[in-house]
């Protein structure tokens, strides 16, 4: 009888141990699959819809072969021309036009460019409002512009322009002048405006983004001023388009930092007559390029232009 009691007690003890140990074992096994454990096979990693093949990436209808974009501006490795300048994100503003159908009144301008046709900019230009012009630092920058939110006035497609002028504010008209800060406004040449909107619209809402400048040929350098106050205008600049720093070097000198005079005209008081001139440009995205012995030693300060042969 005593033996039977001991066997029964042993069975009960074993059952209690099984019941007590089993949950601990199962709990430990589960811990290898929670987010704090090995992430490999966890449903929140790997093929989770928020990663990898997320519907907003890859083959999303608004990306890839979109007629007006190429790759979406909010993603990393985007196509560029002449450098590694990415497309920026879309901003929103307005656009008007100035001048006539032939681009009259759009030549020259606050960036210091001259004959825009000869310099390669043509009619694909715009004057920027104060908020965009940024004291001339955006001269030469390129933008893609699309009309939006006005189906009765907007035309499909987009245009690409180079910033060549400044649209000044008029504080006597605080409510009617589109170029007053902080408004982001493009005053386009008339032919470019008519590519995205109807003439009678006058002013339309637009979305815009900074894009790489695709230019034909090398960067050009125009020499102005006088031997004691040399002024250089770099134009037809690809890549970021806008120049943020410039240096000059004569045959017998080291690199000399130039000061921005106005627009995209840079100056130095160092006399460099009788020397071949080389230039070093840094664009607004930080890319630097050298243009060696661009001029012969007998250059003149009379508006001569010289081809740097290469571009960004």
From Swiss-Prot:
Q: What is its main location?
A: secreted
Q: Write down the InterPro entries for this protein, in alphabetical order.
A: Expan_Lol_pI, Expansin, Expansin/allergen_DPBB_dom, Expansin_CBD, Expansin_CBD_sf, RlpA-like_DPBB, RlpA-like_sf
What keywords is this UniProt entry annotated with? Cell wall, Cell wall biogenesis/degradation, Membrane, Repeat, Secreted, Signal
Signal sequence extent:
1-27
Entry's transmembrane regions:
none
Q: Which domain of life is it from?
A: Eukaryota
6 X 6 AA tandem repeats of H-P-S-H-G-A as annotated region, ranges = 42-77
**Which PROSITE patterns does the entry link to?**
EXPANSIN_CBD, EXPANSIN_EG45
Task: Enumerate the spans annotated as Expansin-like EG45 domain.
Answer: 108-218
What topology does the record note for this protein and the membrane? Peripheral membrane protein
Cystine links in this protein are: none
Its function, per the record, reads: Causes loosening and extension of plant cell walls by disrupting non-covalent bonding between cellulose microfibrils and matrix glucans. No enzymatic activity has been found.
Q: What is this protein called?
A: Expansin-A24
Per the UniProt record, the lineage of the source organism begins with: Eukaryota, Viridiplantae, Streptophyta, Embryophyta, Tracheophyta
């Amino acid at each position: 009888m005593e033996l039977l009691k001991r066997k029964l007690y042993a069975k009960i003890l074993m059952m209690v141990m099984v019941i007590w140990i089993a949950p601990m074992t199962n709990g430990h096994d589960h811990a290898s699959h929670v987010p704090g454990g090995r992430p490999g096979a966890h449903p929140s990693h790997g093929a989770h819809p928020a990663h990898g093949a997320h519907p907003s990436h890859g083959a999303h209808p608004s990306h890839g072969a979109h007629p007006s974009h190429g790759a979406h501006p909010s993603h990393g490795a985007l196509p560029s021309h002449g450098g590694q300048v990415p497309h920026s994100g879309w901003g929103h503003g307005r656009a008007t036009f100035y001048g006539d159908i032939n681009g009259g009144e759009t030549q020259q301008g606050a960036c210091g460019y001259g004959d825009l046709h000869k310099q390669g900019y043509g009619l694909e230009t715009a004057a920027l409002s104060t908020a965009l012009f940024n004291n001339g630092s955006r001269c030469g920058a390129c933008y893609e512009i699309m009309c939006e939110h006005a189906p009765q006035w907007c035309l499909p497609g987009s245009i690409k322009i180079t910033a060549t002028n400044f649209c000044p504010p008029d504080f006597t008209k605080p409510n009617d002048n589109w170029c007053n800060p902080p408004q982001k406004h493009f005053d386009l040449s008339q032919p470019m405006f008519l590519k995205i909107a109807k003439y009678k619209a006058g002013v339309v809402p637009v979305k815009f983004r900074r894009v790489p400048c695709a230019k034909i040929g090398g960067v050009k350098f125009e020499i102005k001023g006088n031997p004691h106050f040399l002024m250089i205008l770099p134009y037809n600049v690809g890549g970021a388009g806008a120049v943020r720093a410039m240096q000059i070097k004569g045959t017998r000198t080291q690199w000399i930092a130039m000061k921005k005079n106005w627009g995209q005209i840079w100056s130095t008081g160092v006399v460099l007559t009788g020397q071949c001139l080389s230039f070093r440009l840094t664009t607004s995205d930080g890319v630097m390029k050298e243009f060696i012995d661009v001029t012969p030693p007998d250059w003149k300060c009379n508006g001569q232009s010289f081809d740097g042969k290469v571009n960004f």
